[in-house]
């Protein structure tokens, strides 16, 4: 009996496999949907200079890509950019640069003008048509929630059938939409009436386009709430238009200015998928929409895509802004760039955004006024250790400084200093103190030391982060202002005096405050010194001053035995030296 021939599965990746990596995980240039990442010349040189395992973005899985599975089904995935060998890396980079430039040049027209001018004036006027009184009586002046559309249909039919008036149904609807829409119920009644007359009386797509445009404009002008009922009525009207004119997407066949108005309606209604469809259509046809509308769209993406996992959330959001690159090249609004900062997971992405702001934006400083704080916060999470994070933060500071004439506002300086403190980069903080001495109060300096204790520990040694630099910082900047700090501030930094020199000086400073009758943290300092074996470095004369204060003597009873022995040794050492 003949056997069924064995089917050998086709290797889908046989002719699709990336030439840049054997496992095919590195996406091809055309598969990447990142709207603003551009590798720097240094990053390109680094990738091309390694014989093996060259990479971009440190090889992290932060590159959004639309790839395909073995069946050819599209998959949205986070991918990394790694290359097995140096062979072909330059070809990949050239291909990506070509795709990037092509995307940036897609838009060559701007949607300008007033959409109201696209509407033909209605022939219906109150002065020459007495029947309009019936319409006024039907609609009334109140914000009626529900309205009988059948009664409206009869009035429309009566007006249209009067040959002396020479009116079309669109004249009636345009008049109603312009003068009698002050509630959701009235608008829904008009939509239902338009639907009922669609098959018999509306025979041109342009007429339907005009009615839909006036509907959207009236809703915006009267600031009507975009309710679920209103959205459903609108979609039913669109379905009726599609059915009448044998099309699947009449909104895409309208004038681009009309499509933009409809896009705004969908954004207001929270329909993200429909908004994405219209947005992509406009961009694909070379139209740049209003920038405030782009901002609203970005805000809609943020509000709708709320996955708990940050990588999944960011990936899905990238899918909705995949064609934003040409809009980014034209953007001037601070809120536009502020909405894009959370998309950055690697400093290479943030630096690409910085490059656009500094090279394309005319009001660069105004953009930084809005975005810089969020950029500082984002930078602190970019880098494999404190050394890289600190370097990225310094690069951000270096980039924005010229746009403030080398004089950053206080809120930005303090934000930079706080993050540098978390990375224990004391030389950078000292530089801020020298350049902006008036920005830092004694208590704020104490808060920087506290932040360094709460920051993530990192054993990586780098200039500015060594232990000795921290000691110098405390000696030169903290202790001279110690007496001006509040009790809470002094308490928060008591553990930082962990060397004999710093500890004894802090004890002396506290004694001066005690002598002045101020509240002190001497108990905390003594307890810390006891645990760190630093009490033996306190001079005998200082112990004598401490023992003259009754409340300090009472508080130091738990350490009395060791303190007495230490003070005795110190006194003996003093006498022998004399």
UniProtKB/Swiss-Prot annotation:
- State where the protein is found: Mitochondrion
Transit peptide boundaries:
1-15
MF terms from GO for this chain are: translation regulator activity
State the Pfam families in the record: AEP1 (PF17049)
Q: Which family does it belong to?
A: Belongs to the AEP1 family.
Does the UniProt entry include the keyword Mitochondrion?
Answer: yes
* Major location (coarse): mitochondrion
Coiled-coil positions: none
Task: Tell me, in a sentence or two, what this protein's role is.
Answer: Required for translation of the mitochondrial OLI1 transcript coding for the mitochondrial ATP synthase subunit 9.
Which GO cellular component term is one of those annotated?
A: mitochondrion
Matching entries from InterPro entries are given as: Aep1 (IPR031467)
**What are the alphabetically sorted keywords of the record?**
Mitochondrion, Transit peptide, Translation regulation
Protein name in the entry: ATPase expression protein 1, mitochondrial
